[in-house]
Amino acid sequence: MTLYSTLYDRALAQITDPLLAQLPEEDLEYMLHDWLMDAIVEPVVGEYDFSDRNEELKQFNFDISERDQKILSIHMVRAWLAPQIRSVTLTNQVFSGKESKFYAQANQLAEMRALDEQLRKDADLLFCRGTYLNNGYFD
């Protein structure tokens, strides 16, 4: 069995956001659950039946490997990052009248997009390495 909280902790360890620490526990868990549900639909996460879970006990009814926990946590971080990249406020700030604000916000948006792309590549690389190691070709 893999507890949701195990995956939540792995994802939170990769995020530095003081606002998350200020959220009530119930709100944070709700957000983490949403990010986890987004992450399990990614096609690059092992051969698991993620529908085999117990929402009351907040666990998957099978063990998820350490490597796949890492991949899921990366996709959870991407789910946390996605709304920030698509933020209307940020977009409005990028296209505001002041040039200095434009460049500062545009750079921030570019950095967040680059971070998202790097996280995607990291997850893909972990998946590919696991595929190569476990395919039986080298046995």
Where are these regions (language model features)?
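Divalent metal-cofactor coordination and adjacent catalytic microenvironments
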Residues: 30-100, 106
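Conserved short "hinge" loops at termini or chain/domain junctions
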Residues: 1-63, 125-139
